[in-house]
């Protein structure tokens, strides 16, 4: 049994914010913001990377049912290429917080920097393994993005996206060099850009 984080740490109207998908060579960066309800405990919350896929899927449904408010947002590949991955991630986090149906009094952001927000915010390094609301956000973002990559694997077969979720694994890099980039590959990322540079020459 995975005990997860102490739900007593949940505070009123504090949003946790996290992202998934900064490192992949393709697909969007997905963010989530979650305000947990202290009166409706969710057991087993933890950093999404520490949970099994089945546990993440179960918690995904429970978080959406029990949270006071939640929002999943994103920045598209075109925005990542235009803005760079850091700025696109900040934009997607901003969208997640702005999309909440309840205004938080504070937003806690996983990592070491905050996006520009209309509410007070603070960064929390390794927040997804310390703050229950950030852990919940990490689960919503990861399950949402993983499901999308499984769908995109059907649209762009041969790259193995359902398995590696767009990350630069040996399988992905080999398929990329053999098949070339798809419309959902990030042109600003070195392995994709280098392939395009070679094809232009």
From Swiss-Prot:
PANTHER family: RIBONUCLEASE H2 SUBUNIT A, RIBONUCLEASE HII. InterPro entries: RNase_HII, RNase_HII/HIII, RNase_HII/HIII_dom, RNaseH-like_sf, RNaseH_sf. Residues 12-201 form the RNase H type-2 domain. CDD domains: RNase_HII_bacteria_HII_like. The gene is rnhB. Keywords: Cytoplasm, Endonuclease, Hydrolase, Manganese, Metal-binding, Nuclease. One of its GO terms (biological process) is DNA replication, removal of RNA primer. It comes from Pseudomonas aeruginosa (strain LESB58). It catalyses: Endonucleolytic cleavage to 5'-phosphomonoester. This is Ribonuclease HII. It comes from the Bacteria. The lineage of its organism: Bacteria, Pseudomonadati, Pseudomonadota, Gammaproteobacteria, Pseudomonadales. One of its GO terms (molecular function) is RNA-DNA hybrid ribonuclease activity. Coiled coil: none annotated. The keyword Cell cycle does not apply. Its cofactor is Mn(2+); Mg(2+). One of its GO terms (cellular component) is ribonuclease H2 complex. It holds the Pfam family RNase_HII. HAMAP family: RNase_HII_B. SUPFAM superfamilies: Ribonuclease H-like.
